[in-house]
Amino acid sequence: MFLTNLTLTNYRNYEHETLSFDQGVNIILGENAQGKTNMMEAIYVLAMAKSHRTTNDKDLIRWNEDYAKIEGRAEKRSGSLALELTISKKGKKARCNHIEQQRLSQYVGHLNVVMFAPEDLNLVKGSPQVRRRFIDMEIGQVSPVYIHDLSQYQKLLQQRNHYLKMMQAREQHDEAVLDVLTEQLMVLAAKITLRRRQFLALLEQWAMPIHHEISRGAERLHIRYEPSVDVSEKAELSRIVEAYSETFAAMREREIQRGTTLVGPHRDDIAFIVNGKNVQTFGSQGQQRTTALAVKLAEIELIFSELGDYPILLLDDVLSELDDFRQTHLLDAIRKKVQTFVTTTSIDGIKHDLIQEAAIYRVHSGSVAAPS
């Protein structure tokens, strides 16, 4: 798939901008704080209905304006696609082919993107929350049902935590209510756990050979899912539900004492293991970068294998972070098949053959000069 055009209205520092894009490589060139990353973020938000940089949607609206709008047209194997996302202080409204989507989970997945930015090193060395967010966003692109289940889980988790807080303060003591909340929560938790495990197994299949090649055959990558309940790697949904039931029963008194839910997908983690060692703890910066790059390239292939279209690749100020060998491997992997957007302050750090192929856009103070 590829994005043919993009219109931004009141988005961050863009008042109104309409752009057409090349099917291959598009380089967004400009100094810092001019709007390069904002444009990259807008493409991501158009696809995912949320930002990778902020959890506050109000940050996306231009100063002193009431709303922001992102519009785009994409070409997919199945045909042309018109997308529109309006962000206001009241929330978000999404349209696909001019039809309003009742839920954002119905909207996400029409346009697929893979983002690779310097902060993606945190995928390997950052907190478990970063890795959970990563897996949730990526599964959501290929499974709208997962987004719905995750949303329901988060709502139930808030309700259960609130009730546990009241039990902790002795404002409530009816354990039958807690039983109902727990039963509803553990079914959703089991579905999420199973889908995460399946997704990570697929991701590992794609990432292992890519990582082996980037490391010049010196390293072997494994991706290990670490759920908050003890279940075998081949456990079916019913067994995972049982495991949650047993664990919740064992943890009940501690949860009431603490006033919070101590078990569930919100406590999961992912470990990246290279040559038998956790890269987060024992890996060098080079190994962490190689792992992050392999995972991002694996995402591209996984999405293609699931959906039949390659996603759009967003490289936000990341090429300068990669040495020549890793840059070459990245560019060879995407050339001729993946529409790519690259932001940079200078083309000096980008390989010459890529520059020759690229359409170059120059950004200054929220205004974009398209290629002549």
Curated annotation (Swiss-Prot):
One of its GO terms (cellular component) is cytoplasm. Keywords: ATP-binding, Cytoplasm, DNA damage, DNA repair, DNA replication, DNA-binding, Nucleotide-binding, SOS response. ATP binds at G30, E31, N32, A33, Q34, G35, K36, T37. CDD domains: ABC_RecF. The keyword Protein biosynthesis does not apply. It is found in: Cytoplasm. Pfam families: SMC_N (PF02463). GO terms for molecular function: ATP binding; single-stranded DNA binding. Its main location: cytoplasm. InterPro entries: DNA-binding_RecF, DNA-binding_RecF_CS, P-loop_NTPase, RecF/RecN/SMC_N, RecF_2. It comes from the Bacteria. The keyword DNA repair applies. PROSITE patterns: RECF_1, RECF_2. One of its GO terms (biological process) is SOS response. HAMAP family: RecF (MF_00365). The RecF protein is involved in DNA metabolism; it is required for DNA replication and normal SOS inducibility. RecF binds preferentially to single-stranded, linear DNA. It also seems to bind ATP. Belongs to the RecF family. This is DNA replication and repair protein RecF.
